[in-house]
From Swiss-Prot:
Record's protein name: Protein E8^E2C
Protein task: Plays a role in limiting the replication of viral DNA in keratinocytes. Recruits the host NCoR/SMRT complex to viral replication foci to mediate repression of both viral replication and transcription.
Family stated for the protein in its record: Belongs to the papillomaviridae E8^E2C protein family.
GO molecular function: DNA binding; DNA-binding transcription factor activity
Comp. bias regions, Polar residues: 15-24
Keyword Magnesium appears in the UniProt entry: no
Keyword tags: Host nucleus
């Protein structure tokens, strides 16, 4: 393999302007480009993993549900941070419009997702899901009693581990 180098007017060789030419005399395989080195890891590994990956409970002002006060008895394992949720299922565009109509009711929910859908769904439909999370079950019930949900939207309630 031969490399052409172009000479500049000041008799300097530019290494950025190169071209690869395959010749019959050169039977060597092409060499791989040099790999970039990753920057050194700055994570302090002396700390236990729980300190690295768990949130500081002092920063989280929401009431966390613990395994002792978990109300979902059908589950065998109950996480320490469980939130009541509502899944709103329906046509994606109507769910998007519903999300905008629910903005004045921000005090009735903790957070609301964008419209999403399951990727493994083989139905090839335009149905989507919006997930609404709450701090308490009372807040969830107040949301469902106050907000008017269109009849084309299906409502599913449950719990989500956060």
């Amino acid at each position: 393999m031969a490399i052409l180098k172009w000479k500049l007017s000041s008799n300097q060789i530019s290494t950025t302007e190169t071209a690869d030419i395959q010749t019959d005399n050169d039977n060597r395989p092409p060499q791989a480009a040099a790999k970039r080195r990753r920057p050194a890891d700055t994570t302090d590994t002396a700390q236990p993993l729980t300190k690295l990956f768990c949130a500081d409970p002092a920063l989280d002002n929401r009431t966390a549900r613990t395994a002792t006060n978990c109300t979902n008895k059908q589950r065998t394992v109950c996480s320490s941070n469980v939130a009541p949720i509502v899944h709103l299922k329906g046509e994606s565009n109507s769910l998007k419009c519903l999300r905008y109509r629910l903005k004045p009711y921000k005090e009735l929910y903790s957070s609301m997702s964008s419209t999403w859908h399951w990727t493994s769904d083989n139905k090839n439909s335009k149905n989507g899901i919006v997930t609404v999370t709450f701090v308490t079950e009372q807040q969830q019930q107040m949301f469902l009693g106050t907000v008017k949900i269109p009849p084309t939207v299906q409502i599913s309630t449950g719990f989500m581990t956060l």
